[in-house]
């Protein structure tokens, strides 16, 4: 009987070690975008992530990790995400994401915008608690990043929270946006201007 117990304990410990090893390996194979931008360009969806300069998990330089690639375009949000992910050296883990920025061009294309929201609701690609805002040209926001003390996603999160605290309006998070759009409730977004955003924090 004691022999069987020892074998069982050894088996359990082996499985635990295997699982721990897999988790560590999976973590090393992930990258952690802090924000996402989605816009419409020349009749197609434009999509990309914003990453921290240094990985928050292992302090790996972005160039070394080879995760910071240019935005991509495609006919649908799904095809854009697939194309972008295929260009990454690591799996994009969006659980730490702070902000989702839509472009004004996308907002004006109501059909394409509705398709994007439908895709996000069906897939759960991004956390429901991330902030959502709009920019005339989301990609222009990246041009300000070199002058920032932190990654753009974390910076925008703090900026939006400061704006809300100052009484500049109620912020929308993705979960609420998806729910209210489904119920046909009008939504008022926070609009960003690249240089104004940089000055106000």
Report each predicted region and the residues it spans:
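A glycine-rich, acidic short-motif signal
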Residues: 3, 17, 21-201
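Bacterial N-terminal signal peptides
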Residues: 11-17
């Amino acid at each position: 009987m004691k022999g069987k117990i020892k074998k069982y304990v050894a088996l359990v410990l082996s499985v635990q070690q295997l699982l721990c090893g897999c988790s560590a390996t999976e973590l090393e194979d992930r990258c952690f975008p802090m924000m996402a931008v989605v816009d419409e360009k020349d009749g197609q969806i434009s999509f990309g992530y914003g990453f921290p300069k240094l990985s928050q998990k292992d302090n790996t330089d972005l160039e070394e990790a080879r995760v910071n690639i240019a935005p991509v375009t495609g006919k649908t949000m799904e095809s854009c995400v697939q194309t972008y992910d295929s260009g990454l050296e690591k799996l994009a883990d969006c659980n730490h994401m702070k902000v989702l920025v839509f472009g004004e061009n996308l907002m004006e294309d109501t059909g394409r915008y509705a398709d994007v929201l439908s895709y996000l609701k069906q897939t759960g690609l991004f956390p429901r608690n991330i902030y959502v805002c709009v920019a005339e040209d989301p990609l222009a926001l990246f041009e300000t990043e070199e002058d920032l003390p932190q990654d753009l996603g974390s910076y925008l999160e703090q900026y939006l929270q400061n704006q809300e605290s100052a009484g500049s309006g109620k912020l929308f998070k993705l979960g609420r946006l998806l729910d209210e759009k489904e119920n046909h409730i009008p939504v008022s977004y926070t609009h960003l201007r690249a240089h104004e955003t940089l000055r106000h924090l």
